[in-house]
Amino acid sequence: MQRLRLLQDRPRVRVSIDGKDAFACILKWIGKARHMIVIQMFVWKDDPTGRMVAESLLRAADRGVMVSISKEALGDAFEWEEDFLTTKNARSGVWHQFWHHPNIEVLYGHHGDHAKVYTIDDKVLLITGMNIADEYRFDWHDILIEVRSPALVQAYLSGGGRTDSLTLVMNRDSISGIRQALRSFLQSAKQSIVLEHAYLSDPEILQILACKSHAGVRITIILPAHPDSHHYANMQSVEWLIVHSLRKNLQIFLYPKMLHSKVTLIDHWRVFLGSANLMQESLDDMGEVNLLIDRSHHRALVKINTTVRLDILKSRPVDAPPSLWWYQRILGWLRL
C-alpha cells in the first residue's frame, strides 16, 4: 500500500512538441477542469487560436469552473491589430461572453511577466514558451511540459519549490531564481551541454559556455536561422563563441524555421526549460517560470533528446564566424 501511494504521489511528466500537440493538451485539460483554472500569459492574440482558447474557457466557466487569467500588458506590443485588450469592446460573440462571464476574471497590468503557465484544479501544471497565437500553434517550433503534481502546482502558486525529481525555478516579484539556477546547472555539466534557444546574448552565459568547452565539455547550440527578432545579437554571440571557445568542443547549428524553444540539456539526462530566454532582460528582470527535470523522468527526457537530435539533422552547421557589417553590429548591440 505504501509503495502504491508513493507511485501515485510521484509527479508525472509529459512532453508536447510543437503547437498542434501542445494546444491539444491545453484544451484537453481545460475540458477536464472541475474547479479552478489559473493562467499566466504574455501574448494572447485575437486570432483563430486565441478565440479557440477563449471558447474553451467559456465552456469551462459555464460548467461552474472559476477561471483566473493574468495577462501581461507588455505582450500587447506583439499583438498588433489582433490586440487582446481591445476584445473587451466586443458587443457580441465569444469575446463579449468571455469578458462578461461571472466566472472569468482577467487581471491585466504592466508586471514584466514573460511566463506562460496554466494550472488546472491544483493538480496539473502546464509550462511552456508558447503564447496564445496562431504562429505558436501552426508555425513555430516549441515545447510544452505537462506535470501532474499537486505539490508542484502549490510550489508555483507560492513562488517556487521542488519535489524529489523536479525543481520549479521562478523570477517573480522579489524572487529572481532563474540566473542562479541556470548558472549552477551549466557549471555542473561534465560531458555535454546542448542549448536549443531562440535568443542567445547574455554575456555571463557565453563566458560559461566558452570556459566549459576548454574544460572538455562538448557544447552544442541550435539557434533559428530566421528568428522573429534578436538575429544580429544571436550572430554576434555565435562569433564570440567561435573565437573564445575550444573549437573542437563547439558545434553551432541554424534551424531552418523559427524555433521558440528554451531547452538547456546537460549530460543528456537533465534538462532546464520553460519561458526564460538566454538574454539579460529575461534572466534578471522579467517574470519567468522554468522547470528542472532529472533523469528519473526517463520518457520525457528521451523525447527531448530525440527532438534535439532530429532538429540538428534539419539544421545547417556554422563553420566560421559570421561576417557582420558595422550597422549589423549596432543592431546586435541593440539586441535586434
Placement of each model-derived feature along the sequence:
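HKD-type phospholipase D/PLD-like phosphodiesterase module
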Residues: R3-M36, V43-S188, Y199, P203, ...
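A structural signal for leucine-rich repeat
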Residues: I208-A210
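Long, C-terminal catalytic modules of enzymes
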Residues: W269-L336
